[in-house]
Curated annotation (Swiss-Prot):
InterPro entries: Ribosomal_uS8, Ribosomal_uS8_CS, Ribosomal_uS8_sf. One of its GO terms (cellular component) is ribosome. This is Small ribosomal subunit protein uS8. NCBIfam families: PRK00136.1. Coiled coil: none annotated. The keyword Chloroplast does not apply. Disulfide bonds: none annotated.
Length: 132
């Protein structure tokens, strides 16, 4: 079966593992998933990200992060631009997620960026997801 939206699948796997309080999540690797995982690590939503090479496409291992009392760091993830309805925005109209408490992941001509980085670099692009 062909997967029509690997980004939505990746976000759903993170959401499900987070709800079940798993420590580690493994997903099939791709460049876009690696970029999203790196942004999540840089912004402090996950502990660590490892890429494991194998004979096929590789595996991304994401180490989820929780607070001291076991509360989830990632409250929710939402896919915005979908294969059936793409969502593009200019840098002036870049959305702020929960007034800056969350991030938007944007695919730009300069690669994957957060909404804040895209605003600073004055580049727009496709809004892939909101994470808060």
């Amino acid at each position: 079966m062909v997967m029509t939206d690997p980004i939505a699948d990746f976000l759903t796997r993170i959401r499900n593992a987070n709800q079940a309080k798993h420590e580690v999540l493994e997903v099939p690797a791709s460049n876009i998933k690696k970029g999203i995982a790196d942004i999540l690590k840089r912004e402090g939503f996950v502990k660590n990200v490892e890429v494991i090479e194998d004979d096929k496409q590789g595996i991304i291992r994401v180490f989820l992060k929780y607070g001291q009392n076991g509360e989830r760091v990632i409250t929710n993830l939402k896919r915005i631009s979908k294969p059936g309805l793409r969502v593009y925005t200019k840098h002036e109209d870049m959305p702020k997620v929960l007034n800056g408490l969350g991030i938007a992941i944007v695919s730009t001509s300069e690669g994957l960026l957060t909404d804040k980085e895209a605003r600073q670099k004055n580049v727009g692009g496709e809004v892939l997801a909101y994470i808060w």
